[in-house]
C-alpha cells in the first residue's frame, strides 16, 4: 500500500526549474493500478520520486507531510529498502540501465541483493516467460526500441 499524506515539496536551489507539489493526498491499495498523467511540470515525476525514496534521500528540498510504503515511512527507510518494493520506469529508460546487455540488466537487481546464483537463474527464466522476452535476451540495450527498453526496465 502507498499513502501520501498532505505532502508539499519544493526543490532546492540546484533544481530551480522543477516546481514540486503542494498538499498532495493519495492512497493506493494493494493490487490497485493507477496512472499519473498531466501536463509537463505538473508534478508527476516529483510524486514518483516521493514514492520511490529519491525524495528526500537524493533530491534536496523542503518537504512537509509523509509518504508511506507498506506501512513504513519512506523518509525513515534506507533507499535500498524502499527499492525492494518500489520501482520506476522512465519514459526513456536509457539513463536507468546499469548494463549493456539485456540479460545482465534483468539479473542485476537480484545480483545486487546478493541472491544465490540458482535463484537468479530461476527468476530470470520466469521473468523471460512472464514478460515474453525470449527474442530480447542477450541483446545490446542500446539497439532496442523505446518500448523494448521499457519492457527490459520493467523486467529488471
Where are these regions (language model features)?
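The feature captures the beta-strand-to-loop junction immediately N-terminal to the Walker
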Residues: 37-39
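Short helical segment in ABC ATPase nucleotide-binding domains corresponding to the A-loop/adjacent helical element
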Residues: 52, 94, 100-111, 121, ...
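Hydrophobic anchor residue at the start of the ABC signature
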Residues: 154-155
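A short, flexible loop at the N-terminus of ABC-type nucleotide-binding domains that lies
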Residues: 1-4, 9-23, 29-30, 55-60, ...
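Conserved ABC ATPase signature
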Residues: 140-144, 148
Amino acid at each position: 500500500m502507498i499513502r501520501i499524506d498532505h505532502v508539499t515539496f519544493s526543490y532546492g536551489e540546484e533544481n530551480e526549474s522543477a516546481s514540486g507539489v503542494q498538499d498532495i493526498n493519495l492512497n493506493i491499495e494493494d493490487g490497485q493500478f493507477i496512472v499519473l498523467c498531466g501536463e509537463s511540470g505538473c508534478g508527476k515525476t516529483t510524486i514518483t520520486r516521493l514514492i520511490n525514496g529519491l525524495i528526500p534521500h537524493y533530491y534536496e528540498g523542503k518537504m512537509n507531510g509523509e509518504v508511506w510504503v507498506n506501512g513504513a515511512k519512506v523518509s525513515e527507510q534506507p533507499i535500498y529498502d524502499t527499492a525492494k518494493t518500489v520501482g520506476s520506469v522512465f519514459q526513456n529508460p536509457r539513463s536507468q540501465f546499469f548494463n549493456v546487455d539485456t540479460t545482465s540488466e534483468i539479473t542485476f537487481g537480484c545480483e545486487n541483493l546478493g541472491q544465490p546464483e540458482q535463484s537468479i537463474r530461476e527468476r530470470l527464466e520466469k521473468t523471460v516467460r512472464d514478460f515474453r522476452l525470449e527474442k530480447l535476451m542477450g541483446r545490446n540495450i542500446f539497439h532496442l526500441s523505446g518500448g523494448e527498453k521499457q519492457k527490459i526496465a520493467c523486467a529488471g
